[in-house]
């Protein structure tokens, strides 16, 4: 046999390299097709025929408590892209998040949140929905749908693969069948929970100095509602008489409860809530720019007294236990009742105490 020349060896080596490269790219191509990625992974400039689904997540947004994968759970059984406009304050965006999650699951769609919602909720909760990349948001041919604040039959059969929701949904009728999942999504980060529990551990009953065994979170909504409710909605906010009746309801049913008061009007609370029994603690800081401190306190209590608003609703929903709420807080002809259904806003087992509407009758007098 003739010995191989140096040139022959070089040619053989090059042939092996070429064949290996071809085999490698064929493997990558087949794998990308099998996983639905197509050529866009290898050729980023290639325009996709259908709008892409973002797999971009901001740091700190794991997809489940046990993984940091950037892909949605059970994504193989879901399709399309749904999101929701983040609008309003803390409680509003919690309602939007929970409603998006529930409706997307019901319709077999992938749910994504926008960066602004992530910025509002992720510092507080262990939320798992991925964040939609801005470039994907801008390229997607959305159909938009404004939701009203209660579940409707048509919401269970939405055929749109690319849907952007809006509105201020915060009704248990959307998501109560997923209560444990919603509670998991809104699990506080450890440092916030521990800080709130540390505050509660330091509380003592005023007369005896004993450590309380039952904590009742009290949220008193003030701020802009003082003008909005009477002037726009023919409604009222909770007054001192309502709070006294609600506290007496708990005193009659629980041994030595302590009432942990939070509000965006703490000065009003100190002036109008009777603390002479030694069981009322004004623990909230009232800082609307950092509402999670008060929110964490409320969720770590056993029971809840709320006035009005989504902040109080979510505190009660996550805390569990007994909840007392302000009922019938508008006049019967209020426009508010066109966008708000009490039976869809408050859980059936919650206890309502009727509001005092006499200030509204005074305003209506000529």
Swiss-Prot record:
Any one of the GO CC terms: Golgi cisterna membrane
One GO biological process term: carbohydrate metabolic process
Ranges annotated as spanning the membrane: 9-25
Reactions this protein catalyses: a beta-D-galactosyl-(1->4)-N-acetyl-beta-D-glucosaminyl derivative + GDP-beta-L-fucose = an alpha-L-Fuc-(1->2)-beta-D-Gal-(1->4)-beta-D-GlcNAc derivative + GDP + H(+); a ganglioside GA1 + GDP-beta-L-fucose = a ganglioside Fuc-GA1 + GDP + H(+); a beta-D-Gal-(1->3)-beta-D-GlcNAc-(1->3)-beta-D-Gal-(1->4)-beta-D-Glc-(1<->1')-Cer(d18:1(4E)) + GDP-beta-L-fucose = alpha-L-fucosyl-(1->2)- beta-D-galactosyl-(1->3)-N-acetyl-beta-D-glucosaminyl-(1->3)-beta-D-galactosyl-(1->4)-beta-D-glucosyl-(1<->1')-N-acylsphing-4-enine + GDP + H(+); a neolactoside nLc4Cer(d18:1(4E)) + GDP-beta-L-fucose = a neolactoside IV(2)-alpha-Fuc-nLc4Cer(d18:1(4E)) + GDP + H(+)
Main EC class the enzyme belongs to: transferase
Protein name in the entry: Galactoside alpha-(1,2)-fucosyltransferase 1
Superkingdom per UniProt: Eukaryota
Protein's organism: Aotus nancymaae (Ma's night monkey)
Coiled coil feature spans: none
Glycosylation sites: 66, 302, 328
Primary role: Catalyzes the transfer of L-fucose, from a guanosine diphosphate-beta-L-fucose, to the terminal galactose residue of glycoconjugates through an alpha(1,2) linkage leading to H antigen synthesis that is an intermediate substrate in the synthesis of ABO blood group antigens. H antigen is essential for maturation of the glomerular layer of the main olfactory bulb, in cell migration and early cell-cell contacts during tumor associated angiogenesis. Preferentially fucosylates soluble lactose and to a lesser extent fucosylates glycolipids gangliosides GA1 and GM1a.
Protein's cellular compartments: Golgi apparatus, Golgi stack membrane
Topology of the protein relative to the lipid bilayer: Single-pass type II membrane protein
Record flagged with keyword Membrane: yes
Lumenal topological segments: 26-366
């Amino acid at each position: 046999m003739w010995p191989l020349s140096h040139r022959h060896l070089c040619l053989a080596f090059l042939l092996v390299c070429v064949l290996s490269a071809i085999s490698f790219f064929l493997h990558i191509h087949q794998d990308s097709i099998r996983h639905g990625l197509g050529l866009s992974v290898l050729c980023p400039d290639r325009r996709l025929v259908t709008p892409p689904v973002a797999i971009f997540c901001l740091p700190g947004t794991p997809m489940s408590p046990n993984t940091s994968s950037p892909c949605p759970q059970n994504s193989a059984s879901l399709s399309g892209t749904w999101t929701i406009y983040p609008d309003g304050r803390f409680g509003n965006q919690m309602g939007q998040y929970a409603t998006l999650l529930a409706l997307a699951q019901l319709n077999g769609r992938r749910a994504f949140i926008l960066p602004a919602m992530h910025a509002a909720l992720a510092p507080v909760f262990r939320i798992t929905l991925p964040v939609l990349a801005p470039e994907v948001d801008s390229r997607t041919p959305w159909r938009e749908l404004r939701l009203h604040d209660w579940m409707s039959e048509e919401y269970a059969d939405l055929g749109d693969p690319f849907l952007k929701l809006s509105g201020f949904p915060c009704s248990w009728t959307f998501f109560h069948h997923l209560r444990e999942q919603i509670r998991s999504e809104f699990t506080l980060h450890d440092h916030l929970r521990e800080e709130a529990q540390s505050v509660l551990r330091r509380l003592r009953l005023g007369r005896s100095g004993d450590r309380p065994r039952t904590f009742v979170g009290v949220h008193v909504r003030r701020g802009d509602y003082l003008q909005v409710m009477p002037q726009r909605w023919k409604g009222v906010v909770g007054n001192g008489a309502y709070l006294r009746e609600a506290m007496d309801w708990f005193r009659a049913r629980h041994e030595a409860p302590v009432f942990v008061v939070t509000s965006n009007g703490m000065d009003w609370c100190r002036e109008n809530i009777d603390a002479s029994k030694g069981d009322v603690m004004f623990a909230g800081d009232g800082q609307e720019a950092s509402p999670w401190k008060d929110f964490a306190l409320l969720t770590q209590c056993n029971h809840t007294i709320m006035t009005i608003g989504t902040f109080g609703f979510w505190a009660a929903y996550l805390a569990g236990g007994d909840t007392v709420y302000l009922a019938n807080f508008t006049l019967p002809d209020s426009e508010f009742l066109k966008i708000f259904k009490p039976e869809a806003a408050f859980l059936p087992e919650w206890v309502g105490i009727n509001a005092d509407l006499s200030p509204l009758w005074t305003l209506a007098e000529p």
